[in-house]
Structures are given as structure tokens and as C-alpha cells.
């Protein structure tokens, strides 16, 4: 697997990552993850050099994070990058932002996220991000070592970014 050095760091990230939004399910009408098959996929990806694993709070109805944490537990923590995302639109107040973040760490069974994104930002979510001081909170988590790299995913017109 080809890897690229991340910016001016020693971190090397695989060109392909494993997204955990569409893991195999036990049936067509459920979000329940087929853990045995999904573990095979994680192990195959890892054994073939994939070291970037991407999840989010709501993937698989909330089951993706509790799956991927234990699925990666057998591997040295520094050998892979785990990314998750803050569902800004789900948070009603600043306390909920903190609760969701800490819940994600616990569900993933990690002390930090290598990459942490504000998820699915658009005009409305940007306003909520500001109102709830999400960026300030995440910067604090970064200073505390609970986030290594901070970013966002964006789903709106380019003009919104201006």
C-alpha cells in the first residue's frame, strides 16, 4: 500500500482508507453490523497496509464507532489513524458537544483521535458551530492531546466558505 507523509510530520498515511459508513450488515433492513465479516474486512485492510480508518457518530445508527474501536484493539495504537466526526447538527448546547465528543472516545476505546472533523458542514451547521463554540472546544481538546489533527467535511455551495 502506498503511503504519503502527512504535511511536515513523520506520520505516513495510506492512500486508501477504510470508511466505516457502509460495513456489511446482518440483513438488508437493519443497520446492525455483521461483526465477523466487518472484522475480516478491517483485518484484510490493515494487513495490506491500510492505516486510515474513518467513522462517525451516526454511521450504522451509532454502531460504527463501538465496532471499529474493538476491531482495531489488537493493533498497536500508533500503527493506525482513526478519524471521527462531530455531528454539530445533533448538539443542542455546549454541554452536549462535550458529551458527544467524550462518548465517541469511549465508544472507540481510544484516548485520542488522529483526525477529527466537524461533520457535514453547511450554512446552517456553520451557524450552530459558532453558536455552540464548537471550534473553541475542539481546539481545547487538541491542546489536551485528545485530537491530533482537526478539520471539517463540507456539503454546501463553495460561496458558503467565503
Region annotations inferred by a language model:
Residues 59, 75-94, 119:
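Structural motif corresponding to the early beta-alpha repeats
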Residues 22-36, 85-96, 124-127:
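Active-site mouth loops of central-metabolism enzymes
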Residues 14-18, 53-55, 80-84, 113-118, ...:
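Hydrophobic faces of well-ordered beta-strands that scaffold small-molecule active sites
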Residues 12, 24, 61, 88-90, ...:
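Surface-exposed, flexible loop/turn segments at secondary-structure boundaries
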Residues 1-80, 143:
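N-terminal binding-site loop/beta-alpha segment at the start of enzyme catalytic domains
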Residues 91-162:
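Glycine/proline-rich, positively charged
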Residues 14, 74, 87-88, 107:
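Proline-rich low-complexity regions
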